[in-house]
C-alpha cells in the first residue's frame, strides 16, 4: 500500500500528487475496478487471448517497420 510522508515545506496538493503517482504505479485503482464485479474464468481467458493477440500484432508491426528501414 502506498504511503506518503509530507515534508514541512510541502503543500497538501504536492503530497496528494505523490500519493496518486504511487497508487498508479502499484495498479491499485485498476485492480479495484477489475475486482468490482465477478468475472468468470471464461471471460478472463477471452481477455487474455485478446491481449496476447494485440501484443503479438504490435510486435509484428514494429518488426516489419524496423525491417523496412534496413
UniProtKB/Swiss-Prot annotation:
NCBIfam families, sorted: S21p
One Pfam family recorded for the sequence: Ribosomal_S21
One GO cellular component term: ribonucleoprotein complex
UniProt KW keywords: Ribonucleoprotein, Ribosomal protein
A molecular function GO annotation: structural constituent of ribosome
Domain of life: Bacteria
Protein's name according to its UniProt entry: Small ribosomal subunit protein bS21
UniProt xrefs under Gene3D superfamilies: Ribosomal protein S8
Protein family according to the UniProt entry: Belongs to the bacterial ribosomal protein bS21 family.
GO BP: translation
Matches recorded under InterPro entries: Ribosomal_bS21, Ribosomal_bS21_sf
